[in-house]
């Protein structure tokens, strides 16, 4: 942490160590509020920070001005040299005590009420639509990157960090999960905002199942598990700019949604299939997903607090 940041923030607890660095819960000494500090190490060369990292930090500084109820607020970005070969980028976010993974793990049987899932998904897609309208592809959506406040407010985190994270990966031998990655990413094809909608579809199914939908242990295995459910795409749909041919996979037919997500209702099943469409061009957008009949009944009709009173926050507040 830079001298300026040390004078402004007081770390009080380590709350996570992952592929992309260490996250601390800290107190803002000026406001007294808690924040989340994320330290990311970036490899440098003889010319200093890679240009891609400089561009990404510039993007992050622009994101400081974002103000959306379903986006985690980025409050500050600071880069400071640690050695000739390494620079530490410190990101300061608003602090939220639990993520969706923790939240779902606390849900008692038989699972979340349908209205709660509608509420969570509507907020999730609203945040995602906002990112996409601002030309930001998240690339790494998963339950750990979706935060849920004790009052049930959903906030997307870790957006706009893809290039910085790719630099960090050279320094950290941690395997990043493949379970929420879109087929075009697994096939190393070109991709854009539809990759996030695929990930959102996987998370949508997980809200019903309370466990991941596709649990592959390699890119090929992940694709096999996907095709076991959605069926093997046609030759016409298979991307041309990939090294893995369609013939590498055995023929499969699409499974009924109620077979792999038996808890889902008819409208939810229709939306899920639209989100888990193989072709990115045919996959529903976040904006169109928000207009889907699944959300026709207002999820705010019931008291939001009633939905969330049975689920406490992931960690106790540090006094």
Swiss-Prot record:
Its EC number is 2.7.11.22. It comes from the Eukaryota. GO terms for biological process: cell division; G1/S transition of mitotic cell cycle; regulation of G2/M transition of mitotic cell cycle; regulation of gene expression; signal transduction. One of its GO terms (molecular function) is ATP binding. Pfam families: Pkinase. PROSITE patterns: PROTEIN_KINASE_ATP, PROTEIN_KINASE_DOM, PROTEIN_KINASE_ST. The keyword Cell cycle applies. Keywords: ATP-binding, Cell cycle, Cell division, Cytoplasm, Kinase, Nucleotide-binding, Phosphoprotein, Serine/threonine-protein kinase, Transferase. The modification Phosphothreonine is found at residue 172. ATP binds at residues 15-23, 38. Residues 9-295 form the Protein kinase domain. The keyword Cell division applies. The active site is at 140 (proton acceptor). Gene3D superfamilies: Phosphorylase Kinase, domain 1, Transferase(Phosphotransferase) domain 1. It is found in: Cytoplasm. Transmembrane segments: none annotated. One of its GO terms (cellular component) is cytoplasm. Phosphorylation at Thr-172 is necessary for enzymatic activity. It catalyses: L-seryl-[protein] + ATP = O-phospho-L-seryl-[protein] + ADP + H(+); L-threonyl-[protein] + ATP = O-phospho-L-threonyl-[protein] + ADP + H(+). Probably involved in the control of the cell cycle. Forms a stable complex with D-type G1 cyclins. This is Cyclin-dependent kinase 4. It comes from Xenopus laevis.
């Amino acid at each position: 942490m830079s001298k300026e940041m040390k004078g402004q923030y007081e770390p009080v607890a380590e709350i996570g160590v992952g592929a992309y660095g260490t996250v601390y819960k800290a107190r803002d000494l000026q406001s007294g509020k808690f924040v989340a500090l994320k330290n990311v190490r970036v490899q440098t060369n003889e010319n200093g920070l890679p240009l891609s990292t400089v561009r990404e930090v510039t993007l992050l500084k622009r994101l400081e001005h974002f103000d959306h109820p379903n986006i985690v607020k980025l409050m500050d970005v600071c880069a400071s040299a640690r050695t000739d070969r390494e620079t530490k980028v410190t990101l300061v976010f608003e602090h939220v005590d639990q993520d969706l993974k923790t939240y779902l793990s606390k849900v008692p049987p038989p699972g979340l009420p349908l209205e709660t899932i509608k509420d969570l998904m509507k907020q999730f897609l609203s945040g995602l639509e906002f990112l996409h309208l601002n030309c930001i592809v998240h690339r790494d959506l998963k339950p750990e990157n979706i935060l849920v406040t004790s009052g049930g407010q959903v906030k997307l985190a870790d957006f706009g960090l893809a290039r910085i994270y790719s630099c960090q990966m050279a320094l950290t031998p941690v395997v990043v999960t493949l379970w929420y990655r879109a087929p075009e990413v697994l096939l190393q094809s070109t991709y854009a905002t539809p990759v996030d909608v695929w990930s959102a579809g996987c998370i949508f199914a997980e809200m019903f199942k309370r466990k991941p939908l596709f649990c592959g242990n390699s890119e090929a295995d992940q694709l096999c598990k996907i095709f076991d459910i959605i069926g093997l795409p046609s030759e016409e749909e298979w991307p041309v700019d990939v090294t893995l041919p369609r013939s590498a996979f055995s023929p499969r037919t699409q499974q009924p949604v109620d077979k792999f997500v038996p808890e889902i209702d008819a409208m939810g099943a229709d939306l899920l299939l639209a989100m888990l469409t193989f072709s990115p061009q045919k996959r529903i957008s976040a904006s169109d997903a928000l207009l889907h009949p699944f959300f026709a009944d207002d999820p705010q009709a019931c008291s939001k607090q009633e939905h969330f009173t049975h689920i406490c926050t992931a960690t106790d507040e540090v006094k």
